[in-house]
């Protein structure tokens, strides 16, 4: 089966964020991209274009990001580099995707659908904490179990202290320098759709909330409008979850999968039944080096 016979997903983890660079658990905290992260996104776009040109296939026709700004900034840079105009739209379980894609707002513009189901795993009370500090507190075995095991789960977040409050926010005086955005303000569409947002997650729970989106939105849309490819910008855990579902990776083996920042991974699926065909990084050497750096996070000294 050749490249032109398959449906292609260009999947990547967002470029480096401000908290990535500080070795801090980010989770649902809305960290911005660093200049390095923006550079990674531009390089990703060039790799995608080179691949499409060399295989005589079209550039992606639709994009997907999480609701967190670091994926949206990564997508913005990629599409700007590719010369593609785009329109962002938040989707929930109440969204009729087919009707939305026929909306005139997308005429001459690539749709980019944003969903919380692509958000990073919610790291609970670990969010905003330095990884070496958590390693020291929990010890190597428990740290690696919670961080890497399919069922490992951090303690729940205290949203009264670790989320920006809508009124009378106390800032860092609560003991937390980095907080996730106020949910009522950030996730209004999800609140209206009665989506249940987590306060801590295992990778297993990320898979559960992401799988319906993959099947009912990404693959269903590809089938209905005969797409050749799409681009998905996610996070370490949401990309691992996509791989687990698409490739059928076991619960045991998924703990050994590490996702580097800003390097496109191509997943090819059979057009007839969307079964897995193959996967490969567009920059395999860099992916290998940077994936090992991800695995080693927390074992370095504090900056």
Swiss-Prot record:
Active-site residues, as the UniProt record annotates them: 14 (tele-phosphohistidine intermediate), 120 (proton donor/acceptor)
Keyword terms of this UniProt record: Glycolysis, Isomerase
GO process terms (BP): glycolytic process
Keyword rRNA processing: no
GO cellular component, one term: cytoplasm
Gene Ontology molecular functions: phosphoglycerate mutase activity
Record: residues binding substrate: 13-20, 26-27, 70, 120-123, 131, 147-148, 236-237
Pfam families, per database record: His_Phos_1
Site note Transition state stabilizer, residues: 235
Domain of life: Eukaryota
Keyword Manganese: no
Recorded catalytic activity of this chain's protein: (2R)-2-phosphoglycerate = (2R)-3-phosphoglycerate
Enzyme class, first EC level, given as a word: isomerase
Remarks, miscellaneous: Present with 3730 molecules/cell in log phase SD medium.
HAMAP family attached to this UniProt entry: PGAM_GpmA
Family, similarity comment: Belongs to the phosphoglycerate mutase family. BPG-dependent PGAM subfamily.
Name the UniProt record assigns to this protein: Phosphoglycerate mutase 3
Provenance organism: Saccharomyces cerevisiae (strain ATCC 204508 / S288c)
């Amino acid at each position: 089966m050749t490249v032109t016979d398959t449906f292609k997903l260009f999947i990547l983890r967002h470029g480096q964020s401000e908290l990535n660079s500080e070795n801090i658990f980010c989770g649902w905290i809305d960290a911005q991209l660093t200049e390095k992260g923006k550079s990674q996104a531009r390089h990703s776009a060039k790799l995608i274009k080179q691949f499409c040109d060399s295989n005589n296939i079209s550039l992606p026709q639709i994009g997907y990001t999480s609701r967190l700004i670091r994926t949206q900034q990564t997508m913005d840079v990629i599409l700007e580099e590719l010369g593609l105009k785009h329109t962002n739209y938040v989707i929930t379980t109440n969204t009729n995707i087919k009707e939305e894609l026929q909306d005139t707002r997308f005429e001459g513009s690539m749709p980019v659908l944003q969903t919380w189901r692509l958000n990073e795993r919610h790291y609970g009370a670990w969010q905003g904490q330095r990884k070496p500090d958590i390693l020291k507190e929990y010890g190597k075995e428990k740290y690696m179990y919670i961080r890497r095991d399919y069922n490992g789960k951090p303690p729940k977040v205290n949203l009264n202290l670790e989320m920006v409050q809508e009124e009378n926010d106390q800032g860092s005086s609560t003991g937390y320098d980095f907080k996730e955005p106020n949910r009522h303000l950030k996730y209004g569409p999800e609140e209206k759709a009665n989506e249940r947002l987590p306060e801590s997650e295992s990778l297993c729970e990320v898979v559960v909330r992401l799988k319906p989106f993959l099947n009912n939105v990404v693959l269903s849309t590809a089938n209905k409008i005969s797409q050749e490819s799409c681009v998905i910008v996610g996070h370490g855990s949401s990309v691992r979850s996509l791989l687990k579902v698409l490739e059928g990776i076991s619960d045991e083996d998924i703990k050994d999968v590490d996702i580097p920042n800003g390097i496109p991974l191509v997943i090819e699926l059979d057009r007839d039944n969307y079964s897995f065909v193959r996967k490969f990084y567009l920059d395999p050497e860099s992916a290998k080096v940077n994936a090992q750096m991800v695995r080693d996070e927390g074992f370095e000294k504090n900056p």
